[in-house]
Amino acid sequence: MTIRKSGDILTELKRLNRLPEIPHTLSLFEAAWKNPTKHIQELANIVEADTAISQRIMDTANSILFRGDGKVLTISNAVTRLGIIETRNIVHAISLHSTFTSPLIDARKFWRHSITAAFAAKKIAEYMNNRFKWQVDPAMAFLAGLLHEAGSVLMARFFLRDFEIVREQSSTFDAFIDNESKLLHMNHAVLGAALFKSWDLPHEVIMAVAGHHHPARIHADHYPIAYVTCLAEGACWLIGEGNGFVEANINQTSQHLLEQLEKHRLTRDHLAFLAKQAQADSESSNMLGMF
């Protein structure tokens, strides 16, 4: 197997023009989102032009989690009901689903893991903000949870044999993290963060993705959201939500996760409780039915 450093991998992908470009609808939506004078109708118009996304927006707006007095029948009403933050989350989820695929990864398990992590990150952010007076934006935490594993799919997509060897030698996800560093001299967190930087996604999301395995290595300003994302990923493993290339074992708790919990005197049981709440929210939102 060829040993590659993270910088070499990114350089090679760029040279071969293989780094995925930001999906068109997501690009339009993010550009409109950054406009301080953005209007909900402008965002609704962007969504409506994409059949796949607009259908999912409608489905989610009429789901158990969001359904109000009656069924919404138009995209404008659906976006109004969901709000622009929830709409943005769905645009990201659907756009990225078509971008991040690999024959080495079970797509259904991968996206179930990612969406559950997104809802878990939101829950954990709210909890940490309340307990420790942190100021993690729950919406940014949701996106970080959704995107945290994207680098793994890039590795599996563009370096199939290398990824397969790492996976074969890893019975747990902790082992996978160790092996990708030892054998590839890089990790999926760095690769995913680099891609999202090229897409000009929010800086705090990029930092959260980059540091979701080692939050303490991230600048102090972004430690809280990186830590939240770290726990969100760990929460998924606690409730059996594997990531599509390493199976979850609810009877085995990651030593790395236990160490992270200890940093702020959190307990495994409470994290599992938040994870179950997040899992219930993800199921009632209808987002899991997207994939």
What is the predicted role of each segment?
Residues 1-161, 171, 175-178, 183-251, ...:
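Conserved alpha-helical "signature site"
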Residues 1-11, 254-291:
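Terminal helices and disordered tails flanking the catalytic cores of nucleotide-processing hydrolases
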Residues 163-167:
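Helix-termination/interfacial motifs at the ends of transmembrane alpha-helices
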